[in-house]
């Protein structure tokens, strides 16, 4: 390895003296010399406080998680969503693209029906002539969601 002529390190004793801490017995104008036990006890105190704060925040977050599911509130929301739908039976008259069908209800109304996720997931095939159960919103009765394919074959 080539020697570095431009690099001249300081003597080891000078570097050690510069890095070594001041002895505890000498007093300077900026700091007080305190025994090591005071620092250790303060450090232990701070660690205990930090741990207690951490435990308190963990307990509070657990309490928040438990309180976030209010059974009375969720049941009222579910009831509202169920109240806003009417269920009708009808037969599919026409197949349209993207899982949509024209459905003629038993009361002679014609509704545009789309397939629900359960029917898509279970790969249930719907063809014109099938009897289906459809869920229609009270606010827009021209569209509905096909929720069930009734057994019993097709109408001819």
Swiss-Prot record:
The record places the transit peptide at 1-81
Tell me, how does this one assemble? Component of the 30S ribosomal translation pre-initiation complex which assembles on the 30S ribosome in the order IF-2 and IF-3, IF-1 and N-formylmethionyl-tRNA(fMet); mRNA recruitment can occur at any time during PIC assembly.
List residues of the S1-like domain. 82-151
Among InterPro entries, the record links this protein to:
NA-bd_OB-fold (IPR012340), RNA-binding_domain_S1_IF1 (IPR006196), S1_domain (IPR003029), TIF_IF1 (IPR004368)
Q: What is this protein called?
A: Translation initiation factor IF-1, chloroplastic
Q: Known PROSITE patterns for this protein?
A: S1_IF1_TYPE (PS50832)
**PANTHER family linked:** TRANSLATION INITIATION FACTOR IF-1, CHLOROPLASTIC (PTHR33370:SF1)
User: Function, please?
Assistant: One of the essential components for the initiation of protein synthesis. Stabilizes the binding of IF-2 and IF-3 on the 30S subunit to which N-formylmethionyl-tRNA(fMet) subsequently binds. Helps modulate mRNA selection, yielding the 30S pre-initiation complex (PIC). Upon addition of the 50S ribosomal subunit IF-1, IF-2 and IF-3 are released leaving the mature 70S translation initiation complex.
Q: Name one Pfam family in it.
A: eIF-1a
Start-end of Low complexity biased regions: 67-76
What keywords would UniProt list here?
Chloroplast, Initiation factor, Plastid, Protein biosynthesis, Transit peptide
- Classification via SUPFAM superfamilies: Nucleic acid-binding proteins (SSF50249)
One function term, GO molecular function aspect: translation initiation factor activity
Region annotation Disordered: residue ranges? 51-79
Q: Which family does it belong to?
A: Belongs to the IF-1 family.
Which compartment or compartments is the protein found in?
Plastid, Chloroplast
Q: Which GO terms describe its cellular component?
A: chloroplast; cytosol
């Amino acid at each position: 390895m080539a020697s570095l002529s431009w690099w001249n390190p300081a003597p080891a004793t000078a570097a050690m003296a510069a890095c070594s801490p001041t002895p505890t017995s000498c007093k300077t104008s900026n700091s007080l010399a305190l025994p090591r036990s005071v620092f250790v006890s303060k450090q232990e105190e701070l660690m205990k406080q930090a741990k207690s704060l951490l435990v308190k925040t963990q307990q509070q977050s657990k309490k928040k998680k438990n309180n976030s599911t209010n059974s009375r509130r969720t049941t009222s929301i579910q009831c509202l969503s169920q109240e806003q739908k009417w269920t009708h039976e009808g037969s599919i008259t026409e197949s349209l693209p993207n899982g949509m069908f024209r459905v003629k209800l038993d009361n002679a109304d014609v509704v545009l029906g789309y397939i629900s996720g359960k029917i898509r997931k279970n790969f249930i095939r719907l063809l014109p002539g099938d009897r289906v159960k459809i869920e229609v919103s009270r606010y827009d009765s021209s569209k509905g969601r096909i929720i069930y394919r009734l057994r019993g074959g097709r109408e001819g």
